[in-house]
Amino acid sequence: MPFIPHTEEDIQAMLASIGANSIDELFDEIPPALKTGSLKRVPPGLSEMEISRLMLERAEQDGRYLNFIGAGAYEHHIPAAVWQIATRGEFYSSYTPYQAEASQGTLQLLYEYQTMMASLTGMDVSNASMYDGASALAEAALMAVRSHRTSRRILIPQTVHPVYRSVVRAIVKNQGIEVVEVPYDKLSGQTSLDGLKNFGSEEFAALVIPQPNFFGVLEDVDTLTDWAQSRDAFAIAVVNPMALAMLTPPGEWGEKGADIAVGEGQPLGIPLSSGGPYFGFMACKQPLVRQMPGRIIGRTTDQEGSDGFVLTLQAREQHIRRSKATSNICTNQGLMVTAATIYLALLGPEGLRRTAAQSHANTAALLEKLEKLKGVKRVFSGPVFHEAVISLPRPSASVLQALEARRILGGLNLKEYYPELGDAVLVCATETKTSGDMENYVTQLGEVIRNS
């Protein structure tokens, strides 16, 4: 189909073929009162050059902000080569057709991605991505219930991202699945082991285990994993992939390892970009692979013995099983996965470890400086990765607003999600922050607190 505007002759020919005299006549059935006529607030058209200039002017109004917000989406340095490669025509505009084997390059890249994510999580198999971390967790909950067969209850700690918990409830509630929340320890910020004991001998399909949790605190993942599996429940890990460069992978948690690992892939080379698009990842142990949603790429050989890549285990998918499929997800976030694969390949294991280690070191240094401010305290005693919760001596909303006026995004106000914490803020410092950035933040925060 050529993308060429209709000429006046084309329009008259089409009107004549349907017996209409004008375009307006096609809309005669709409009452005049419902017709707006011209849109008064729509400005006249601009040339390409004028639009470019206008967009630059609008962008300059935003300015540059120093960002200390994390909470599930993190500002990491992305090598220029990542998106230079990802936006090549072979990747950027390609699509895996229903005869997927015709796209060997795309399939090979997705296969490499799966290999990297399986290695990073310590699991047996990975799929080719999910929409985002929250929906990946919801799919993991559905997967656990299908595999468990006797229980339709999921335990989710309150230390899991509140938006993730909301998404899980929204997706599973119409399938007769109950979501039960586990309280957190008010001192450590970790999932309360005493809270788990209160469930007695009740049966659950799975326990969700965040690492690190929403507060930035590292959980006792070995104990939680063993607790779940000792009760014949699945252990679902929700992990930050950047943290896995330093921490024990889910596949090695406890005595047997977690059963399913999911998370948000944004830290792996995806820009913040106003909230998306991102991608979710999912990996699992081999016995659960037939319950895993999403595309899975396999490696095989053709009739001549050459290596090739295929979509495998397709009987799980909606284009084969329709309503009986594990999920209606299909190609989804392929371009984001392409960028993540390039990012992981460029950094390699050592580069990923350096990035994670610098993020951890920056957050530790920032917390040390913040705690020297009068009235600023760490809320939880548990160890952290690269973000933590601090309490402020002034209303958190007004403090953050004052910092924003100074072009500093000072953290996430937790009052909406955890009102019991009072004026608490979740702060994050990745490897992108210099000592000068952190010193500036602490200085400005101190001035705001003193002047409030």
Swiss-Prot record:
Coiled coil: none annotated. GO terms for molecular function: glycine dehydrogenase (decarboxylating) activity. GO terms for biological process: glycine decarboxylation via glycine cleavage system; nucleoside metabolic process. Keywords: Oxidoreductase. It catalyses: N(6)-[(R)-lipoyl]-L-lysyl-[glycine-cleavage complex H protein] + glycine + H(+) = N(6)-[(R)-S(8)-aminomethyldihydrolipoyl]-L-lysyl-[glycine-cleavage complex H protein] + CO2. It comes from the Bacteria. The keyword Oxidoreductase applies. Pfam families: GDC-P. Its EC number is 1.4.4.2. The keyword tRNA processing does not apply. Belongs to the GcvP family. N-terminal subunit subfamily. The glycine cleavage system catalyzes the degradation of glycine. The P protein binds the alpha-amino group of glycine through its pyridoxal phosphate cofactor; CO(2) is released and the remaining methylamine moiety is then transferred to the lipoamide cofactor of the H protein. The glycine cleavage system is composed of four proteins: P, T, L and H. In this organism, the P 'protein' is a heterodimer of two subunits. This is Probable glycine dehydrogenase (decarboxylating) subunit 1. It comes from Nitrosospira multiformis (strain ATCC 25196 / NCIMB 11849 / C 71). The gene is gcvPA.
